[in-house]
C-alpha cells in the first residue's frame, strides 16, 4: 500500500499470491460491487469463481482440496479484499473459521465429505453462534439438539449469521445437554439442502446494516430439524465450548487484520484526497494539522 513499507511477514510466494488475488478481484468482483450492495449479497457463482481460482480454503491441507498454505495466506486474501473495497465476500467465515473447525475436530469422513466442496465453492458455509437473547455469551445459548435414535432434533433460533442467505452448510452451536452450562455445548453441522422448508429449517430476513451492504447477514430458525448424529463435530457431546475457545483467538485475529487493512485503505484515500483538493487556493497538505496527523498515522499504522 505504501511504497516504502515492506511487511516483515511477506515473502516472495506471498507477493505472488497477492498479485494474483489483486488481479482476480479487479476482474471478477470489483465491477459488480455496486450491484451486489443493492441486492444485499454477492452472486452465488462468485464463490465458484473464487474456488476455481484457488482462493477458498487456502490454509486447509491439499489432501482435502485446500491450498496447503497457512495463516499468512489467509491474511493476504483478507487484506486484498479490504484494499479492493470488497465488503460482501464472507470468505473469512467460510475458509478461515468453519473450514478449520472441520479440519481440527472433524472425523476423516467429515473432512473428505465437506472440505473439498468448500474449497471448490460448491459448498458455502456459515457458523451459527449468536442468538437474539444471548449475544456473545456462548454458555447461555438456548438452541438445543436432543438425541433421538440416529438423529439430533434441533430447535431454536440464531441471528447475525454471515452468509446466512447463501450457506448450505452451517456449523451450529447447540446445547446437547440443556441442564449443563459450558459442558453441555456441542457443534453440529447442518446440511441445509436436506432440511430446508418441510424439514423445519428456515431462513429469516436478510438484515439491513450500516455497512457490509453486500454481505448476507441473516436470522435462521430450527423447528424440530432432524440432523444425523454423525454430523456432530468431535464425536463426543459437550466438547463444543472448548472447541470454540480454541478457535476464537484466530477468528478475532482475522477480524483485527481486516480492520488494520481497512484503516490502511482509509489512510491511502485520505492522502490522495489531501494531495488533490484545493482549499481556499491552498492545498490541504500544506496544513500543519493535516500533515502532523498523517505523519502520526503512517508511523503508527503497523504497531
What does each of the following model-derived ranges do?
Residues 143-145:
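A structural signal for short hydrophobic beta-strand segments in well-ordered beta-sheet cores
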Residues 284-303:
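Single conserved hydrophobic/aromatic residue that forms the stacking wall/gate
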Residues 5-13, 17, 201-283, 287:
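Glycine-rich beta->alpha junctions and the first turn(s) of the following alpha-helix
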Residues 91, 118, 133-136, 160-163, ...:
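Short Gly/Pro-enriched turn/cap motifs at secondary-structure boundaries
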Residues 151, 155-202:
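A short core secondary-structure module
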Residues 121-129:
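A short, Trp-centered hydrophobic/proline-enriched beta-strand micro-motif
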Residues 68-78, 137-141, 221, 227:
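Structural signature of FAD isoalloxazine-binding scaffolds in flavoprotein oxidoreductases
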Residues 52-122, 162-169:
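Internal helix-loop-helix
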Amino acid at each position: 500500500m505504501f511504497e516504502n513499507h515492506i511487511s516483515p511477514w511477506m515473502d516472495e510466494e506471498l507477493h505472488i499470491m497477492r498479485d494474483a488475488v489483486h488481479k482476480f478481484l479487479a476482474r471478477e468482483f470489483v465491477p459488480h460491487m455496486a450491484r451486489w450492495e443493492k441486492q444485499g449479497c454477492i452472486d452465488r457463482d462468485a464463490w465458484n469463481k473464487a474456488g476455481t481460482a484457488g482462493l477458498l480454503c487456502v490454509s486447509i491441507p491439499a489432501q482435502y482440496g485446500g491450498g496447503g498454505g497457512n495463516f499468512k495466506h489467509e491474511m493476504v486474501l483478507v487484506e486484498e479484499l479490504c484494499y479492493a473495497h470488497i465488503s460482501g465476500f464472507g470468505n473469512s467465515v467460510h475458509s478461515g473459521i468453519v473450514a478449520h473447525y472441520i479440519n481440527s475436530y472433524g472425523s476423516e469422513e467429515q473432512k473428505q465429505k465437506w472440505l473439498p466442496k468448500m474449497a471448490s465453492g460448491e459448498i458455502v458455509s456459515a457458523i451459527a453462534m449468536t442468538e437474539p437473547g444471548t449475544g456473545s455469551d456462548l454458555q447461555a445459548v438456548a438452541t438445543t439438539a436432543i438425541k433421538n435414535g440416529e438423529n439430533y432434533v434441533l430447535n431454536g433460533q440464531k441471528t447475525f449469521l454471515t452468509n446466512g442467505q447463501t450457506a448450505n452448510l452451517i456449523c451450529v452451536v447447540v446445547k446437547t445437554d440443556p441442564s449443563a452450562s459450558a459442558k453441555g455445548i456441542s457443534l453440529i453441522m447442518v446440511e441445509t439442502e436436506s432440511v430446508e422448508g418441510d424439514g423445519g429449517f428456515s431462513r429469516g430476513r436478510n438484515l439491513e446494516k450500516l455497512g457490509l451492504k453486500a454481505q448476507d447477514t441473516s436470522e435462521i430458525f430450527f423447528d424440530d430439524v432432524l440432523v444425523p448424529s454423525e454430523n456432530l463435530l468431535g464425536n463426543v457431546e459437550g466438547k463444543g465450548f472448548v472447541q470454540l475457545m480454541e478457535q476464537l483467538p484466530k477468528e478475532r485475529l482475522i477480524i483485527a487484520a481486516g480492520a488494520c487493512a481497512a484503516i490502511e485503505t482509509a489512510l491511502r484515500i485520505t492522502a490522495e484526497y489531501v494531495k488533490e483538493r484545493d482549499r481556499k487556493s491552498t492545498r490541504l497538505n500544506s496544513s500543519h494539522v493535516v500533515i502532523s496527523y498523517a505523519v502520526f498515522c503512517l508511523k503508527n499504522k503497523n504497531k
